[in-house]
Amino acid sequence: GQLLESHEIPTAAHKGGPHILEKTKQIVASYLEKDSVAGVAISSAGMVDPDKGEIFYAGPQIPNYAGTQFKKEIETSFDIPCEIENDVNCAGLAEAVSGSGKGASVTLCLTIGTGIGGCLIIDGQVFHGFSNSACEVGYLHMQDGAFQDLASTTALVRYVAEAHGDPVEQWNGRRIFKEATEGNKLCMDGIDRMVDYLGKGLANICYVANPEVVILGGGIMG
């Protein structure tokens, strides 16, 4: 396939699941006005049941998102097929098909951001587990807390802000890495702490999954 068009549209996640569903339907409608569309593929945060095409669990960052039935709503409204998958699973599958995991028998993909998401690709297929919640590694219990509460960008920002005595809103990952390169000791300490926890968490996952390739993604990994 060839990418023909690309757009960025604010999610406004704080407005909740019904808003996101309605926004998605508006986007689909806008494309149908211009051209024929063979189908819709949705990559979404949260725990996704790809067979039912719905979100069955989501964190507090997106209110009222659990239960959102994308597949049913899109197919009923527009009479075209719709598939939905977890966003990290989509990223991992893309890496396995045409990226750094191409040709690997077992690929582990983690995305580091607000939390930590995980995906396991086995022989080119997403491993969903019994109830579509496999590789939710952010909730992995470590000695000092949950994995994503220690090694995510959110955790890094919180640590650095507290170390400086600043409100969290004054910091972000980009600023932390920039100031670390300029010699800010507290920023360097925060990054070292994050990398240490990230390494420990990765090691634990690798003990279980034994991946051939490990891929790290997310905003601060660029």
Task: List each language-model region with its residue ranges.
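Residue-level detector of conserved, well-ordered beta-strand and adjacent loop positions
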Residues: 10, 56, 141-143, 217
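Glycine/GP-enriched mid-protein hinge/lid loop-to-helix segment characteristic of carbohydrate kinases
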Residues: 2-7, 15-19, 75-77, 83-85, ...
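Active-site charged/polar residues at nucleotide-handling catalytic sites that mediate phosphoryl
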Residues: 35, 209
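Glycine-rich phosphate-binding loops at beta-strand->alpha-helix junctions
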Residues: 48, 205, 211-222
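Glycine-rich phosphate-binding loop and adjoining helix at the ATP-binding site
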Residues: 12-13, 17-25, 29, 36-40, ...
